[in-house]
Every structure is written in structure tokens, then in C-alpha cells.
A protein has these predicted regions:
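Conserved N-terminal phosphate-binding loop of PLP-dependent enzymes in the Aspartate aminotransferase
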Residues: 1-443
Length: 443
């Protein structure tokens, strides 16, 4: 009997033993190619020496000091390092312990910004359907995945949702890419006007929608128009880069590839590359100064925020990304992975779309290519693909509910930045085999 309250109470999981590079090994010695980084976490693979060394050095100095009493060299260095790779108006980093905490902090920061600015009536959040922003109550409230929200709706703060920017599903045949971008973005303006601009404080979005929809990038011009709308109606733009940030998309942050900058940006997952739990909210000068020049106190906090060892791990992670030129590697291997996925899978009758940026890919499964009808829920495609992939020595991240939280299936891929060409061959080969084996059960 296990005394652990596992997320699936009746699951029988292999016991992890060790990690080396892009591979994980269980207690029986079985080797798994990590093609998803757990959940887009393990940017540097497993057992990276520079990160382990930085953590050990910090442990030998001091493992923990509460931020109500001390700051630390590692947290100061991390905040500085993050800001060095941000646009010039981002100069303050709030350090927490994970993605949900980062989003919760950003939501409260947005609220306090307007309270400090003399606009306490601004209290409504707008986000997007099929978004995912975390599992804590505030983050779940702005999230747009109905399956995750449903049991907890009675205790969620009311939030409002518009359609996602999801070209494969919603761009019409007669629309140009820009035309679709503007139509999708203008839903935000319509929702703001419906609620009253004086009541809306922030719009929350993932630049690349991650787990719930499968690496869905925005179309060209979408976020440029979103930024214009936010500016027009005095609404903060919060971008959630918990999954797509810190190099995953091929740039340090995904919004760098858009024509828009946020007011607050959240990051986590790859920030510590899985070596320690850590997250961050980066505030632009406008938001920070409103609080600093007002009460001077952000009314929020957690015991383990800015944890010295976690910060040391994150410093080493970011330094490694830039010193080893891993963003170049991400973009180079992205092209190879896209080509191999397309060659091996695109012709299959159940592959609807292969999409993504950097080393962040989604493969959407369908019952019919022309109509884009989803696979039946009865196929249990996500569960069966995950199980069979593990049997084949591959870790990928299949999910159900791609379209609306109930219907649709996709596979998310987010391999480590250190992945080599022969690993990509192995990844695509094992994934192709897995899909062909599982597809036999759909007939």
C-alpha cells in the first residue's frame, strides 16, 4: 500500500530512480525518453551538473531565510538576471514557488494596482476559453477549462471568458490570418464594453496555449490588437508564460515574438528546470511604481517565496541557457522536430494539426481530417496513448478536452533544450509506433 495521496488514487506508477540527460530511468532500469519535460519543466534535462553545483553551494551557505527578515544573494541575482533579458520597463520581479502561485500573485497585484491608483471599482478579470492558469482557486477562476472548473464553480470568483485564438478550429476559410486575428481580438473589446470599462481590471492569456489545447500559438497581429484594446480601456495585460516561457518557444519569453508587451508576466516550470520549485511575476514600472509610491506594501506573500536554493537553481538555469546558446539550439531542433513529425504523422487519417513554436508542439487528433470531427471520448485516446508510449519508453503529454474541455484529444511535446538529432529520431519513431498501435483500438 502507498501512503501517498496520488492524483489518481488507483494508478500504478513506476518508481523513478535516476535521470541522465534526456532520459529517466525507473527502479527496474527501464529507460524513458523525456519528450515532454514532465509538463514543459525539464528544459536542461536531468542531472545537469551546473545546476546541481549551484544548489549545493547555496545549501552549504544557507538553505532558507524568511523574506520578512532577509533578502539573499541568489534572489537578488535571479531578479537582476531576469530583468536583463526583459524589455527596459521591466525592473522588478516577485519570486514565488510555482506557476499557480505566480498567477495568483499577478491577479492580486493587478487588483492592488487599481486600488492604489484610486480605481477600486475595477475588479473584473477577462480570460479565454480553453486557457489554463493553474489549479488554485484564483487561477482556476480565470482559467477557461470547464472540466477543471466544474466541481469548484460554486466557490470560484466570477470571471469572464472570450473565445481563444485557435486558428485550426475557428479561422474561417475566407479569412486572412490578420482578419481572423482582429476578429478574435475584438471579442475582448466587446466583452469590456458589455461589462463596462470602469469595472474591468485585467485580461489574462497564454501567448501559446499549453496543456489544455496543445501548444496553440496566436496568429499574427492578435496580441498587437489585444494590447491596443487594453491601453484604450485602461486594462492590464497579464501574460501567463508559465509553460511557454524561459526559452521554450525559441525566445526567452514567448511575447518577444508578438507585437505587444504585457504589464505583468508570469513564469515558472522551466525557470528552475525542475531542479527546484520556483515561479515569478515580472511587473512593469507602471504597476510597480503605483504600489511603491502608494502604500509601499504588496499585501501578499508565502513562506517559501524567493527561496535561496530555488533561486540559485534558477540563476544557474538561465545562465546555462544563454552561455550554452540553447535558444539557438531550440530553434534549430524545432525545425528538425517539425519536419520529422510532419513527415511521419501528417498523412495519417487521425492527425488533424501539428503546431507550435520552439520545442513546444501540439498534435491534434481527429476522427476525420476534412470535417475536423474529434475522436470519440470512448476511445480514451489520451489515456491509452500515454500508457502505450510509456511501455515503448517514451514520455509524452496526451490530453483530452482539447476543443471545449470535454471533446477532442491532443499530444503535447516539450523535450529538453539539450535534445540532439538522434534523440528526435527516437522520439518521432516511438511516437509514430505508439499512435499506430493505439489507433488500432479506435476501429
Amino acid at each position: 500500500m502507498s501512503y501517498v495521496f496520488h492524483r489518481h488514487c488507483h494508478a500504478t506508477l513506476p518508481i523513478i530512480d535516476k535521470g541522465e540527460g534526456v532520459y529517466l530511468f525507473d527502479k527496474h532500469g527501464k529507460q524513458y525518453l523525456d519528450a515532454c519535460g514532465g509538463a514543459a519543466v525539464s528544459n536542461l534535462g536531468h542531472s545537469h551538473q551546473a545546476v546541481k553545483k549551484a544548489m549545493l553551494e547555496q545549501l552549504e551557505r544557507v538553505p532558507f531565510a524568511h523574506t520578512g527578515f532577509f533578502t539573499s544573494d541568489s534572489s537578488e541575482r535571479l531578479a537582476e538576471l531576469i530583468c536583463q533579458h526583459m524589455p527596459e520597463q521591466f525592473n522588478h520581479v516577485y519570486l514565488v514557488s510555482g506557476g499557480s502561485e505566480a498567477v495568483e500573485s499577478a491577479l492580486k497585484m493587478a487588483r492592488q494596482y487599481f486600488v492604489e491608483s484610486g480605481k477600486p471599482e475595477k475588479k473584473q478579470f477577462i480570460a479565454r476559453q480553453q486557457s489554463y492558469h493553474g489549479n488554485t482557486l484564483g487561477a482556476l477562476a480565470v482559467g477557461g477549462n470547464e472540466w477543471r472548473r466544474e466541481p469548484f464553480k460554486p466557490i470560484l470568483h466570477p470571471s469572464h471568458h472570450i473565445a481563444p485564438c485557435y486558428a485550426y478550429r475557428y479561422q474561417q476559410s475566407h479569412e486572412s490570418e490578420l482578419g481572423y486575428s482582429l476578429r478574435a481580438a475584438n471579442e475582448l473589446e466587446a466583452k469590456i464594453l458589455e461589462l463596462g470599462a470602469d469595472n474591468v481590471m485585467a485580461f489574462v492569456a497564454e501567448p501559446i496555449v499549453g496543456a489544455t489545447a496543445g501548444a496553440v500559438p496566436a496568429t499574427q497581429g492578435y496580441f498587437k490588437r489585444i494590447r491596443e484594446i487594453c491601453d484604450q480601456y485602461d486594462v492590464l495585460l497579464i501574460l501567463d508564460e508559465v509553460m511557454c516561457g524561459v526559452g521554450r518557444s525559441g525566445s526567452f519569453l514567448a511575447f518577444e515574438q508578438e507585437e505587444a508587451e504585457p504589464d505583468l508576466v508570469c513564469m515558472a516550470k522551466g525557470l528552475g528546470a525542475g531542479y527546484q520549485p520556483i515561479g515569478a511575476v515580472v511587473a512593469n514600472d507602471r504597476v510597480y511604481q503605483a504600489i511603491a509610491d502608494g502604500s509601499g506594501f504588496f499585501q501578499h506573500g508565502h513562506t517559501f517565496m524567493a527561496h535561496p536554493v530555488a533561486c540559485a537553481a534558477a540563476v544557474a538555469t538561465i545562465q546555462t541557457i544563454f552561455q550554452d546558446d540553447l535558444l539557438t539550439a531550440v530553434n534549430r531542433q524545432s525545425a528538425l522536430l517539425r519536419n520529422e513529425l510532419t513527415s511521419a504523422l501528417a498523412h495519417l487519417p487521425y492527425i488533424g494539426d501539428i503546431r507550435g513554436k520552439g520545442l513546444f508542439f501540439g498534435i491534434e487528433l481527429v476522427a476525420d481530417k476534412e470535417s475536423k470531427a474529434p475522436l470519440s471520448k470512448a476511445t480514451l485516446a489520451d489515456k491509452r496513448i500515454k500508457q502505450r508510449a510509456m511501455e515503448n519508453g517514451l514520455m509524452c503529454y496526451p490530453m483530452g478536452g482539447t476543443i471545449d474541455g470535454v471533446n477532442g484529444h491532443h499530444i503535447l511535446l516539450a523535450p529538453p533544450f539539450i535534445i540532439q538529432s538522434h534523440h528526435i529520431d527516437e522520439l518521432v519513431g516511438k511516437l509514430s509506433l505508439t499512435l499506430k498501435e493505439v489507433a488500432e483500438t479506435w476501429k
